[in-house]
From Swiss-Prot:
Name of the featured protein: Protein SPIRAL1-like 2
Organism annotation: Arabidopsis thaliana (Mouse-ear cress)
Domain of life: Eukaryota
Feature: compositional bias, Low complexity: 40-52
Swiss-Prot/TrEMBL keywords: Microtubule, Phosphoprotein
Length: 110
């Protein structure tokens, strides 16, 4: 197959970007009268179960729905509420003091 030769694959879905000149074709669904009758009398049990799941999916990943600490922080990309609930590795001491590595370097003893 040469360069610029189509291998088939059907119509491009990028027509909305490049202006295909054609409106997208809608698929027509034909129902028989028996299908429409049975669907009109079907109990709405699946719809009720789907609504309960949808309310859970409304909370973004990594955020606990019961946490009140869901605000954006301007400290960097690795701050905020994590999915893993691991403790932070951020250094919490001022430069030059309060190091937890004194046991390695012999500091802290006068």
């Amino acid at each position: 197959m040469g360069r610029g030769v189509s291998a088939g694959g059907g119509q491009s879905s990028l027509g909305y970007l490049f202006g295909s000149g054609e409106a997208p074709k809608l698929a027509a669904v034909n129902k028989t009268p028996a299908e429409t009758e049975s669907s009109a009398h079907a109990p709405p049990t699946q719809a009720a179960a789907a609504n309960a799941v949808d309310s859970i999916k409304q909370v973004p990943a990594g955020l606990n729905s019961n946490s009140a600490n869901n605000y954006m922080r301007a400290e960097g990309q690795n701050t905020g509420n994590f999915i893993t609930d691991r403790p932070s590795t951020k250094v919490h001491s001022a430069p030059g003091g309060g190091s937890s590595l004194d046991y390695l370097f012999g500091g802290g003893s006068n």
